[in-house]
Amino acid sequence: MINNKPIIGIPIGDPAGVGPEIVVKSLTQAEIYEKCNPILIGDAKVIKQAMGFCNVNLNINSIKKVDEGKFTLGTIDLIDLNNIDIDELKIGKVQGIAGKAAFEYIKKSVEMAKEGELDAIATTPINKESLREGNVNYIGHTEILADLTDTEDPLTMFEVRGMRVFFLTRHVSLRKACDLVTKERVLDYIIRCSEALEKLGVKDGKMAVAGLNPHSGEHGLFGDEEMKAVVPAIEEAQKMGYKVEGPIGADSVFHLALKGRYNSVLSLYHDQGHIATKTLDFERTIAVTNGMPILRTSVDHGTAFDIAGTGQASSVSMVEAIILAAKYSPKFKK
């Protein structure tokens, strides 16, 4: 039975990691069903095993189509791909069968989202080594999703307690990140981040651009990247009509955003934004992938092989990712 709540697809991730466990725990929470209709994409055998690890007793409703879902607390609605030999699965270990299965869960989720069966997807952890062992030639979720949706350059946003953070650079050295702070790149990201916010239905407020150097360079005393690149980019963006301010010192900009002065912050390098969000609330820092024709949220932790199978993994991040997907999906513009 389908109601008017958003339908959120949840691929269960690497079946040898904590993904199945955090999903099972999440679906014991009434809040999830109050805000959305969750559907798992995975393997019934893996879910049953995860329930055993977590000492959780839920019914499994294996379905072929979304409209067969019950969407009631106490029942897991599952698209069962039946693609794992549970006797061969080694919990907490890198293995090709797990990587291949995880990829198939993602692929099915994307297909359903592209066909309009899902309003968004909330993804669970996968393992890069297991993908490689399974001959899946991607390094992670974002690359898989980009390829499956024909998206050239997806944009990552973190959200925690209402604070949104974008990243000018991500997985590059700090030295290279400084070299990538150019007027052209900063302007491009201001435009793209503004468009991403609009797609999510965020229309009020201004974006802030963080400074790179101490005190945003102090007029060139501590570095000139702000004077040469950041300020000219912001001024040009303002002339184009974009609501943006900065550069604002990184020691205060996140505090100001959290207080509501800004609707988002453009962080200039990986750790600048990661430290701010994860110090605020590590478990509730959720990644939102923008720029694709589908909406995707994700936990920001890994497969945690060291505790997989113990039932110890916290589901706080997973619950938050599902709820955030439900929050944005009614406003999301493809």
Curated annotation (Swiss-Prot):
It catalyses: 4-O-phospho-D-threonate + NAD(+) = dihydroxyacetone phosphate + CO2 + NADH. A divalent metal cation binds at residues 171, 215, 270. Binds 1 divalent metal cation per subunit. Its cofactor is a divalent metal cation. The keyword Transferase does not apply. Substrate binds at residues 141-142, 278, 296. Its EC number is 1.1.1.408. InterPro entries: PdxA_fam. Keywords: Carbohydrate metabolism, Metal-binding, NAD, Oxidoreductase. GO terms for molecular function: metal ion binding; NAD binding; oxidoreductase activity. It is an enzyme of class 1 (oxidoreductase). Homodimer. NCBIfam families: pdxA, PRK03743.1. Catalyzes the NAD-dependent oxidation and subsequent decarboxylation of D-threonate 4-phosphate to produce dihydroxyacetone phosphate (DHAP). Belongs to the PdxA family. PdxA2 subfamily. This is Putative D-threonate 4-phosphate dehydrogenase. It comes from Clostridium botulinum (strain 657 / Type Ba4). The lineage of its organism: Bacteria, Bacillati, Bacillota, Clostridia, Eubacteriales. The gene is pdxA.
